[in-house]
């Protein structure tokens, strides 16, 4: 994926999700204020959701334990740095329930939500399976929350 001409632009996101175990809706809700590269922490106290009637809302984390200040490694901090440097924000950033400065936006200037990333993951797997004989199973952003690396992070607390 890192060297793929199409999907290399999502490498940092996949890396962050895999190495932190962050839920995709938590990642989508991250704003520039939540990321402290100097102290290598990420504040996770909310998530971005899009309702069935297409409204964007901020909700608290899924559980009380989900509210946390997540320490990040140097390599994860570097991935966030790349995302921040390459961030393509609209001229006027939308505020969702008082939050603005999201990391990724769609063509309409709205923050990306879990569904956007699910589509990207489906396309990444499809491209891989078109190229390689050994097929990759369908993956979802939610799967990253249960990775062994994520479990190690969670057990550190």
Regions found by a protein language model. Give the residues of each.
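Basic, Lys/Arg- and aromatic-enriched nucleic-acid-binding interface segment
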Residues: 1-24, 28-30, 38, 67, ...
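Basic, Lys/Arg-rich DNA-contacting stretches centered on the C-terminal catalytic core
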Residues: 2-4, 25, 38-71, 75, ...
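Short, contiguous acidic/charged loop-to-helix segments that flank catalytic cores in large enzymes
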Residues: 2-5, 57-67, 105-114, 129-143, ...
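C-terminal catalytic core of tyrosine-transesterase DNA break-rejoin enzymes
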Residues: 12-15, 19-26, 115-116, 120-123, ...
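Active-site proximal loops enriched in glycine and acidic residues that flank catalytic Cys/His/Asp
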Residues: 18, 31, 39, 46, ...
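Phosphate-binding active sites in nucleotide-utilizing proteins
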Residues: 34
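Flexible loop/turn segments at secondary-structure boundaries
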Residues: 51-52, 111-112, 148
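Active-site/catalytic core of tyrosine-dependent DNA strand-transfer enzymes
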Residues: 73-132, 151
């Amino acid at each position: 994926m890192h060297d793929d001409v199409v999907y290399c632009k999502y490498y940092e996101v996949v890396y962050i999700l895999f190495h932190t175990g962050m839920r995709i809706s938590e990642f989508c809700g991250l704003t520039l204020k939540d990321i402290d590269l100097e102290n290598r922490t990420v504040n996770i106290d909310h998530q971005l959701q899009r309702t069935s009637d297409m409204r964007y809302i901020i909700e608290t984390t899924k559980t009380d334990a989900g509210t946390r200040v997540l320490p990040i490694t140097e390599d994860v901090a570097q991935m966030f740095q790349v995302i921040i440097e390459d961030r393509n924000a609209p001229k006027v950033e939308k505020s969702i329930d008082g939050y603005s400065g999201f990391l990724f936006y769609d063509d309409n200037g709205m923050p990306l939500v879990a569904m956007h990333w699910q589509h990207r993951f489906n396309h990444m797997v499809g491209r891989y399976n078109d190229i390689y004989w050994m097929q990759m199973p369908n993956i979802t952003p939610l799967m990253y929350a249960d990775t062994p690396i994520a479990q190690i992070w969670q057990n550190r607390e």
